[in-house]
């Protein structure tokens, strides 16, 4: 596999903790990251340890299983008006832009409804 985190991405402090930002203008429909995942397990969301809920994704083959994304995947913040999406496949997690994103802007994904039913404060 050719895993990568684009060199134009950077991590910065935000009011929500860390976040992923772009140093250059990015067009829509660009894959900015392809990272592996590990630590697959099966559990109900409410039984998933709280410290893991912030960093897990649904397994691509079974949404009842969870994986931990590597690379920057656990650092992207949520926004209801997200400008990127996360996609899982057998070979890893992809982060793909949905809109044009200007240099200096934060890249946001949507965590999904299950995340918010777990009791996390919504931004």
Question: For each predicted feature, which ranges?
Answer:
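Conserved catalytic SET/PR domain of SAM-dependent protein methyltransferases, capturing the structural core
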Residues: 1-123
């Amino acid at each position: 596999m050719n895993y990568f985190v684009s060199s134009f991405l950077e991590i910065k402090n935000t009011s929500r903790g860390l976040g992923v930002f772009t140093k250059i203008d990015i067009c829509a429909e660009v894959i900015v990251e392809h990272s592996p995942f590990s630590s697959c397990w099966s559990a109900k969301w409410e039984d998933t340890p709280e410290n893991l809920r912030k960093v897990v994704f649904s397994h691509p083959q079974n949404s009842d299983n969870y994986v931990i994304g590597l690379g920057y995947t656990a650092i992207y913040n949520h926004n209801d008006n997200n400008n990127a999406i996360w996609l899982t496949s057998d070979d890893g997690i992809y982060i793909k832009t949905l809109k044009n994103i200007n240099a200096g802007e934060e890249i946001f994904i949507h965590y999904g409804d299950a995340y918010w039913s777990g009791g996390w404060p919504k931004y």
